[in-house]
């Protein structure tokens, strides 16, 4: 992660610090940990935060992951900010020419991406090595291919291949595929691939393929579009088949040990061991007439008035856990009566770290609201109650 170490200097900086498109507006001090602060900054019209941590012999200044910037922009921001310090060490050199310039899609702008996309969509959830996903994009140049993955090394590997092969129709999103599907409009996908997911036979609630996921997939698929599960785990296959048989709006196709053009490293290993591999295709048959409206999920704070005296109580609020979602106030930072609230919240399957800015006149999430899903919206409503001191304790 880009960062720099600086000698301790207890002389406060004079904000704002401005250079080019960068502005470092002010510094918020932690109410929970006096050695931590957040620098509130902007690049053009995008807000971001830097973490500033006072240690025994130095300051550590680095990015705040909840407000990401492109790596080179972040490095430039840190280089500019470091000019106000006596730097001990840093890793802010220019990127190697061999580094990938391709970036993942931002969850915060994913809704706009889907709305603007006019091409048929093919999705692979949990693409691993990326072999199948890359071939999918190469063989379907007029279609939009979307790979969804949570594993960062797999994503980095796929991004390098996308850039190397110049696959302009292939996009990568880091997130939980279950939540991503829930946020998508009806009938936007032709095919959804789930190849060799973790079986989670001892913790079945963690599986990708569940009754809820199947219903969302069939809603998102066009009529005659299909969800394809490929697995070497017989119990996962049998449980998934039972889920499909309970559904009244699908057609099922089953294959065993079918030969396919693209074989992953994982599959090649099982082939050598003569292990059975199961394919389950579930076709969507009906046109879902129920309107999809995630715009009903309002993530604004327009109805809340914050008492500054209540901030201490908010900070002491214990993590609140409900069925499927939670809210945890991790920290609060202050600058002249304005506050930054650091949060972990949302759906248990894919919780998010966010910051909310509280000023006398406005309250809003920095840069992005949570993904528009039902559990995230429930978590937002719970957060409103916490901030307004309703139903706490």
From Swiss-Prot:
S-adenosyl-L-methionine binds at residues 124, 149, 176. Substrate binds at residue 232. It is an enzyme of class 2 (transferase). InterPro entries: SAM-dependent_MTases_sf, tRNA_(Gua-N-7)_MeTrfase_Trmb, tRNA_methyltr_TrmB_bact. Pfam families: Methyltransf_4. It comes from the Bacteria. Pathway: tRNA modification; N(7)-methylguanine-tRNA biosynthesis. PROSITE patterns: SAM_MT_TRMB. Keywords: Methyltransferase, S-adenosyl-L-methionine, Transferase, tRNA processing. One of its GO terms (molecular function) is tRNA (guanine(46)-N7)-methyltransferase activity. GO terms for cellular component: tRNA methyltransferase complex. Its EC number is 2.1.1.33. It catalyses: guanosine(46) in tRNA + S-adenosyl-L-methionine = N(7)-methylguanosine(46) in tRNA + S-adenosyl-L-homocysteine. One of its GO terms (biological process) is RNA (guanine-N7)-methylation. Belongs to the class I-like SAM-binding methyltransferase superfamily. TrmB family. NCBIfam families: PRK14121.1, tRNA (guanosine(46)-N7)-methyltransferase TrmB. Catalyzes the formation of N(7)-methylguanine at position 46 (m7G46) in tRNA. This is tRNA (guanine-N(7)-)-methyltransferase. It comes from Helicobacter pylori (strain ATCC 700392 / 26695). The lineage of its organism: Bacteria, Pseudomonadati, Campylobacterota, Epsilonproteobacteria, Campylobacterales. The gene is trmB.
